């Protein structure tokens, strides 16, 4: 399942990273079940294996969210402005894994 998730996520990370002008230091898939993704202070972006079963527009939303953390390391208004700028599927509703 992790390999399938990476196959689905990596092209979207590459697309949005290029569009947004950011570069993650690495992209990986984890066994996390309580969060869709995370971004470390060193630029490593991690995604839950559970994304493999989600629709493409949801994957894009998670990818954009995590890549925005490469610029804004918080959930400030500037962070959410950036999310809205790049995520055409932005929804205020929060989705919980599992």
Language model features with spans:
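Active-site-proximal or metal-binding-adjacent scaffold patches in catalytic folds
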Residues: 1-61, 70-98
